[in-house]
């Protein structure tokens, strides 16, 4: 059996398979189905400074090869996470990632500060959140806006910092370079693509917010290309994601240069997918005589 362990900066993962934020809660429900401590890591449900009820109306809509969501970051807030979810989350024998979002720069800073002394291994900063002081445009669209967020957060935390990039950014490679320049320990990509669906019977958008995030197999080829481009242009490690539903998808992302991979939408299709991907990577390595993932990472 090959060695699945990977080093992401200063953090060691037992294997490269991470459950993506917003698709795995804080792990409790899935732990009733299988031993989630076999996973490499879990990225928590997206946390905001204050508790959020989420969006009204339709939140999830199935597409031909994936799904759209407009959940609206429903979450217990950072303090709620610390009080009610962290006692379970912190005891897991895997890499514990806190995904943090915000509506203002101050929200990001206060949220991360509250987690600084908590048993968290990585902060994953979600810069796809709308900036309420800039007309709702996401922080992760323009490089210089993202630069300020990354710089300020980097200045107030010593925890490993990973920036989750939006595929809707004006220049995703440039965005990754900005994150590296401002001291991020890594980047994760891609988040969901801005998309739309229309209810033709009622002649209105399916979602109250009109647009929603597209994920699932439909986005994989584009996500893979973006991960490959970023990996070729930065010297910090990358967590690759976007449409991964099986072990061969994960292996493609690793061959494109990703150190780790994240699995999101596939959790809704098959709640055991994380374990199946780990087993599939193991089988591939045995079949191909691969001793370490370093042998195939970034070979494309």
UniProtKB/Swiss-Prot annotation:
Any GO CC annotation of this UniProt entry: cytoplasm
UniProt cross-references to InterPro entries, sorted A to Z: Aldolase_TIM (IPR013785), DHO_dehydrogenase (IPR050074), DHOD_1B (IPR033888), Dihydroorotate_DH_1 (IPR024920), Dihydroorotate_DH_1_2 (IPR012135), Dihydroorotate_DH_cat (IPR005720), Dihydroorotate_DH_I (IPR049622)
CDD domains in UniProt: DHOD_1B_like
One GO MF term: dihydroorotate dehydrogenase (NAD+) activity
Residues at which substrate binds: 45, 69-73, 126, 191-192
Record keywords, A-Z: Cytoplasm, Flavoprotein, FMN, NAD, Oxidoreductase, Pyrimidine biosynthesis
Function: Catalyzes the conversion of dihydroorotate to orotate with NAD(+) as electron acceptor.
Name of the protein this chain belongs to: Dihydroorotate dehydrogenase B (NAD(+)), catalytic subunit
Source organism (scientific name): Clostridioides difficile (strain 630)
Underlying gene: pyrD
């Amino acid at each position: 059996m090959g060695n699945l362990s990977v080093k992401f900066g200063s953090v060691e993962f037992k294997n490269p398979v991470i459950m993506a934020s917003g698709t795995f809660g804080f792990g409790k429900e899935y732990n009733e189905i299988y031993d989630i401590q076999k996973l490499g890591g879990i990225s928590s449900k997206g946390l905001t400074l204050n508790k959020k009820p989420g969006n009204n109306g339709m939140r999830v809509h199935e597409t031909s090869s994936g799904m759209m969501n407009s959940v609206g970051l429903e979450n217990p807030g950072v303090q709620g996470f610390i009080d009610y979810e962290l006692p379970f989350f912190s005891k897991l024998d895997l890499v514990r990632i806190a995904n943090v979002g915000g509506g203002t720069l101050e929200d990001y800073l206060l949220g991360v500060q509250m987690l600084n002394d908590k048993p968290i291994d990585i902060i994953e900063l979600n810069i796809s959140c709308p900036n309420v002081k800039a007309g709702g445009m996401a922080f992760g669209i323009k490089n210089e806006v993202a630069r300020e967020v990354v710089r300020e957060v980097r200045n107030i935390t010593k925890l490993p910092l990973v920036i989750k990039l939006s595929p809707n950014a004006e220049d995703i490679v440039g965005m990754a370079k900005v994150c590296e320049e401002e001291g991020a320990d890594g980047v994760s990509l891609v988040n969901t693509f801005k998309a739309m669906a229309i209810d033709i019977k009622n002649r209105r958008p399916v979602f109250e917010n009109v647009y929603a995030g597209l994920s699932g197999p439909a986005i994989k080829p584009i996500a893979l290309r973006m991960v490959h481009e970023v990996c070729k242009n930065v010297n910090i490690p990358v967590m690759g994601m976007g449409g991964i539903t099986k072990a061969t998808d994960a292996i493609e992302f690793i061959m494109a240069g990703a150190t780790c991979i994240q699995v999101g939408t596939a959790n809704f299709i098959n709640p055991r997918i994380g374990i199946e991907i780990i087993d599939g990577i193991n089988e591939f390595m045995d079949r191909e005589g691969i001793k370490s993932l370093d042998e195939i990472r970034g070979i494309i």
